[in-house]
Amino acid sequence: MAKKSKIAKNEKRKEIVARYAERRAELKAIIRNPNTSDEDRLDAQFELNSQPRDAAAVRVRNRDSHDGRPRGYLRKFGLSRVRMREMAHRGELPGVRKSSW
């Protein structure tokens, strides 16, 4: 079980990313566009740098939806490998079967 503060911090980061996502995409498009003037590109870079660090999507950590475990995360299920295995053995994941060959 992850610390509650770590889970809460990650949720806060998700909210900040959502709030700034549209403007960040606009600024990145301006920076990447080869037809943009140097002055506009520089202004866009300064604005992007002045945004909070947590506005970057790479700072959000994928965590297990049940206990917040940060490692061994399986995107398809939204669970860690440990929790997924436990739930699969109990038959709580529809369509998941133990493999046999």
Swiss-Prot record:
What are the protein's UniProt keywords?
A: Ribonucleoprotein, Ribosomal protein, RNA-binding, rRNA-binding
Any Gene Ontology biological process: translation
Q: Which regions are flagged for Basic and acidic residues bias? A: 61-70
Say if the entry is tagged with keyword Flavoprotein: no
What's this chain's function?
Binds 16S rRNA, required for the assembly of 30S particles and may also be responsible for determining the conformation of the 16S rRNA at the A site.
Task: Describe the family membership recorded for this protein in Swiss-Prot or TrEMBL.
Answer: Belongs to the universal ribosomal protein uS14 family.
- Which proteins does it associate with, and in what oligomeric form? Part of the 30S ribosomal subunit. Contacts proteins S3 and S10.
How is this protein named in the record? Small ribosomal subunit protein uS14
Organism of provenance:
Corynebacterium glutamicum (strain R)
